[in-house]
Amino acid sequence: MPGHARSVADVGAGDGQLARHLAARGLRVVATERRPPSFARLRVALPQLDCRLGEGLEVLRPGEVEGVVLAGMGGHSIARIVAASPAVAGALDWLVLQPQQHADRLVAWLEAAGWRIDARDIAVQGRRSYTVLLVTGHERS
């Protein structure tokens, strides 16, 4: 995540651990979940944060946050979420993406859509490793 970041949406926030960590670092955080049971647990876990129920980026307004984190889902799902909300996605300065699979296909899609891969790293969790991408520079039309 860019060091200068001030606001972020954690899309598909799950149990809220990442959102809580980001808020503790001083960022303004919007945490989202698409399923009502998961959203209810998120609201209980993070009563002090802005938690929203809805699909992907659809619960955000263009320019409301500087960037988004999409982690713990497949590359195809990440691409679908970004593509489904072009006004919101086009207003983002950056994305941090951690696809569970199909990272290379996601990178190809992002580049074709006008995004630039600024950093690529590997995160290790137990026996598994995952690609982590910092994506910026969407060509706004």
Residue locations for each model-derived region?
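Conserved SAM-binding motif I beta-strand of class I
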Residues: R28-E33
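Short SAM/SAH-binding signature in class I
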Residues: V65-G72
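Short glycine-rich anion-binding loops that position phosphate/pyrophosphate groups of nucleotides
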Residues: G14, M73-H76
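S-adenosyl-L-methionine
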Residues: P36, A40-P62
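Class I S-adenosyl-L-methionine
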Residues: V59, E64, H76-S141
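Conserved SAM-binding loop of SAM-dependent methyltransferases across substrates and taxa
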Residues: D15-L27
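Conserved class I S-adenosyl-L-methionine
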Residues: R6-G14
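Conserved alpha-helix/loop element of class I SAM-dependent methyltransferases that forms part
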Residues: M1-A5
